[in-house]
Amino acid sequence: NVAANLATCFGLNTAIASAMADYPIGRRIEAAVRKAGVTAYYQRFPFDGVRGPNMAIVWSDRGQGVRGPTVFYNRSNEAAGRLKPGSFDWKAIFAKKVRWFHSGGIFSALSPTTPALVIEAMEAAKKAGAVVSFDLNYRAKLWAVAAAEQGLSSAQAEEGAAKTLRNIVSHVDVLVGNEEDLQKGLGLKGPEAESKGKLDPTAFFGMIGQVTKDFPNIKAVATTLREVHSTNRHSWSAVLWLDGKNYTAPTCELDVYDRVGGGDGFAAGLFYGLLSGKSPEESLKLGWAHGALLTTTPGDTSMASLDQVEAFAKGGSARIQR
């Protein structure tokens, strides 16, 4: 999602390294990646005609009114779970002047081999001089299923997830994650001061000291803030800690069409701003604006233009453009 957003909305050259199963669903996904303008480096796997390996299939009910959105998926025998260190020639990939490498907690939870692959890629990125970012995206279901396959309990799953993610985050420059991600994903304690509400940044900023104490390599931490009034009505903001300073985006009221992908939209806008040499405030607002606009259209990737994002970041409105 982040790579597609940066390509389609922000006009950057992007690429992904992933798995591809050679069967019709895989070819459909491959075509969509090409259409988004994203270069792909695939480790290909033959499909056996019956059981896979498969491409993950995700269903989303965007909800309406009092019916909340629901996301469920089938990741059985997923091709990406077969990826491991050595699956990609990182030296060749990063030789193409890559400036930023991004990964996340969902991919890291797919199998026992994917975390080591993430770290291998991060180490190669560092050697090439690229910025390394990571979205914690803590998903209890994914970690629980992976642990259950090894005969572990849910408590052991959470402990194992924190151990794995802490190892990965020790290689990261820019971290994306909210208070729950930081607590469950990294095993950090919550702040003593209670948050006044979903949009109050106190809880988030209150945890930064723990983050930087445990991970002195971290230069920036960011997340969105969202208060849900109904499925289609949200209050929306975002926060950024960068080089010791706190930044908070404005709060706006969103009429939401499809909330899935808003977080990736925020990350893409933030990364674009930082890559483009924008100020921390401008970068945060670009992420905030792009994430907001993404929730107004179906799907989890952007249909917005850079002009629209910049206008909204500067205080644009929903007045008709003629």
Positions of PLM-derived features:
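Anion (oxyanion) recognition and catalysis
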Residues: 7-8, 34, 119, 123-127, ...
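Hydrophobic faces of well-ordered beta-strands that scaffold small-molecule active sites
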Residues: 16, 132-134, 175
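Conserved phosphate/ATP/ADP-binding segment of small-molecule kinases
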Residues: 140-244
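Conserved post-catalytic alpha-helical subdomain immediately downstream of the catalytic base
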Residues: 231, 250-316
